[in-house]
């Protein structure tokens, strides 16, 4: 039997848009800003530059180890939530989606996206209930194609 002890917990953090901090050269982090939008940043890749930045920071001079910083838009967060949620066997909890984003999923994606997704449902690649959207085992084999609808 497959148990929860076989679950990759750090991936679940990424796929749930939960905060995480990365330490060390090339490490990436994700935090939630005051406005609720996602903030991403990563450290320099050079070990020497990373260590030097910490030495300088401790001496109160010089730049930080952060090399790049980006702030998500609302649609970035929505798209990432859907894209990563569909990677999980449990799929997307539509109640959590509404709480997080203040609207139903299909208010963000109507028209051709919804129509194309319904074709995947009709073909047995995805399943939809009142509470959940998920990919079936058959759908996992073409998951990137399905997830691309929401990016």
Regions found by a protein language model. Give the residues of each.
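C-terminal scaffold of the Radical SAM
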Residues: 1-106
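Minor-groove-contacting beta-hairpin "wing" of winged helix-turn-helix DNA-binding domains
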Residues: 132-136
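Short, well-ordered alpha-helical segments
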Residues: 108-116
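Short, amphipathic alpha-helical interaction segments positioned at domain boundaries
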Residues: 138-151
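An alpha-helix initiation/capping motif
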Residues: 76, 111, 137-140
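Short secondary-structure transition/capping segments
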Residues: 7-11, 119, 141
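A short, conserved structural fragment
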Residues: 118-131
């Amino acid at each position: 039997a497959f148990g929860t002890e076989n679950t990759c917990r750090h991936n679940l953090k990424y796929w749930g848009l939960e905060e995480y901090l990365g330490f060390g050269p090339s490490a990436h982090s994700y935090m939630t800003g005051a406005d609720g939008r996602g903030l991403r940043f990563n450290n320099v890749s050079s070990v020497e530059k990373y260590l030097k930045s910490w030495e300088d920071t401790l001496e109160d001079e010089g730049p930080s180890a952060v090399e790049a910083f980006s702030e998500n838009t609302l649609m970035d967060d929505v798209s990432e939530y859907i894209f990563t949620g569909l990677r999980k066997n449990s799929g997307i909890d539509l109640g959590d989606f509404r709480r997080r984003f203040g609207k139903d999923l299909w208010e963000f994606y109507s028209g051709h996206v919804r129509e194309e997704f319904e074709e995947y449902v009709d073909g047995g690649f995805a399943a939809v209930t009142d509470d959940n959207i998920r990919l079936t085992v058959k759908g996992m084999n073409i998951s990137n194609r399905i997830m691309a609808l929401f990016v």
